[in-house]
Design a protein with these regions (language model features):
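Boundary/linker segments flanking structured domains
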Residues: 1-239
């Protein structure tokens, strides 16, 4: 038995290179920005790159936005109460008629805007966020597989089919975002680019021996998956 498990990572574009062995895996989305995003874009209204970079942050934050929670209850005389609660999620695009955020949130937004005020500050912000995944970030999805390559390929196929469907049927986006049956479908519905998705895998092939059979490995991996779901609450998990 080895002293340490094998850990590796693959872009969704490259999952054909994943090992054909049992293991655990987690999907992450990386933040992508380049000089064209942080360099100054002069205009009559000032530097357009500030708003452009803020929109880039909003899009990235939106990948992690939880779905609304449905609530229901009963009152006196059989009255029924129903509704949903949405998290006051940071950086959400303001909508007309929406309630104004509290003073603390507005102050934090002002501080954020100051950190995007110059080309160099935007570059530093981009570098921090690019380095943060996966070290500081919560996974989008955690899974267990008997054959890692086969499972990751299935995720890619689900993503591709959902992406192609939504291109022609954009009206189905919210339904798939909320009730998509697979990680690939839900990721496509959140408009996450395939090339931004990366799977980190724990390969258990070297752990198999006379005392730890493939069945034992699967059971152990499933127990670890159950625990990791409850610790990290991956936003695109089965829940």
């Amino acid at each position: 038995m080895t002293d340490s498990l094998s850990l590796d990572h693959f872009s969704m574009l490259d999952v054909d290179q994943a090992p054909e062995s049992p293991g655990l895996y987690a999907w992450y989305v990386s933040f992508r920005a380049g000089p064209h995003d942080w360099k100054i874009k002069p205009s009559a209204d000032g530097d357009q790159a500030i708003e452009g970079f803020l929109n880039l942050l909003r899009k990235y934050a939106g990948y992690y936005e939880p779905l609304p929670i449905d609530l229901s209850g009963r009152g006196s005389y059989g009255a029924k109460w129903e509704g949903s609660l949405e998290l006051d999620f940071p950086l959400r695009e303001p909508t007309e008629g929406a309630q104004t955020s509290d003073d603390d949130s507005l102050q934090r937004l002002d501080t954020l805007m100051d950190s995007l005020d110059t080309e160099e500050r935007r570059r530093v912000m981009a570098t921090i966020l690019q380095k943060a995944s996966p070290v500081f970030s919560t996974p989008l999805y955690i899974g267990v597989a008997t054959n890692l390559r086969e499972r990751l390929r299935k995720h890619r196929l689900d993503y591709t089919r959902a992406h192609d469907w939504l291109r022609d049927h954009p009206e189905d986006t919210e339904a798939i975002r909320a009730r998509g049956k697979s990680f690939g479908q839900r990721a496509a519905a959140r408009s996450i680019a395939m090339e931004h998705l990366e799977a980190w895998v724990i390969d258990l092939a070297d752990e198999e021996n006379d005392e730890v059979t493939k069945k034992h490995l699967r059971n152990t991996a499933e127990s670890a998956e159950w625990l990791l779901h409850r610790l990290y609450s991956p936003i695109l998990g089965r829940q």
